[in-house]
């Protein structure tokens, strides 16, 4: 009886010790549009540890100051891909950039170059289905970015296992700008 009680208490202590830790800090999850007066550059993002893999030609993306594809490691040293779009202001990001971003986000994303409004970098916005798929599913593609946030004058497109994780990844990178 004592042995069962001791084992139960040890098990309970382990569960309580591990149960409070989450993989992300959900208390810092940002709204989709926030920090309206913030003005950021790609250098602000690279100063957080964001690594640029590719800078896109934005000559056909009206009023954009630049778009960069790259990755960033969060506090748990886990790397995620992002696309960062910078505009002169949040107002211009909303007016000129929102439709282009919403077109490539989520399940209904436009991922064919022939159908996309802004073709530059479209190959980096696609993912192939996992290796466990077979048949026609094995060759299907899906959107890499499941969510985005508009943080000041920047638009941050984020990956994640689902919408909640993607939003948290957006928030984690954006919140790191203020550290």
Predicted regions and their residues:
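Second-shell loop/turn segments in exported
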Residues: 27-32, 80-86, 154-163
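Short, solvent-exposed recognition patches
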Residues: 42, 46-136, 140-141
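N-terminal "mature-domain start" segment
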Residues: 19-76, 167-179
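Positively charged n-region of N-terminal signal peptides that target proteins for export
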Residues: 1-4
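Repetitive helical segments and hydrophobic/amphipathic motifs
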Residues: 11-12
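A short, solvent-exposed beta-edge/loop patch
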Residues: 118-179
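C-terminal motif of bacterial Sec signal peptides marking the signal peptidase cleavage site
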Residues: 15-17
């Amino acid at each position: 009886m004592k042995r069962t009680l001791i084992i139960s208490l040890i098990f309970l202590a382990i569960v309580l010790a591990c149960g409070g830790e989450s993989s992300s800090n959900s208390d810092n999850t940002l709204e989709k549009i926030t920090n309206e007066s913030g003005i950021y550059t790609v250098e602000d993002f690279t100063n957080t540890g964001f690594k640029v893999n590719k800078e896109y030609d934005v000559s056909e993306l009206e009023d954009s100051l630049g778009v960069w594809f790259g990755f960033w490691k969060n506090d748990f040293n886990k790397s995620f891909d992002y696309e960062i779009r910078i505009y002169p202001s949040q107002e211009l990001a909303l007016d000129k950039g929102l439709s282009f971003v919403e077109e490539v986000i989520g399940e209904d994303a436009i991922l064919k170059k022939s159908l996309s409004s802004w073709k530059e970098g479209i190959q980096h916005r696609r993912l192939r289905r996992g290796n466990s798929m077979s048949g026609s599913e094995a060759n299907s593609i899906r959107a890499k970015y499941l969510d985005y946030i508009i943080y000041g004058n920047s638009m941050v497109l984020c990956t994640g296992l689902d919408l909640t994780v993607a939003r948290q990844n957006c928030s984690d990178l954006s919140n790191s700008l203020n550290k």
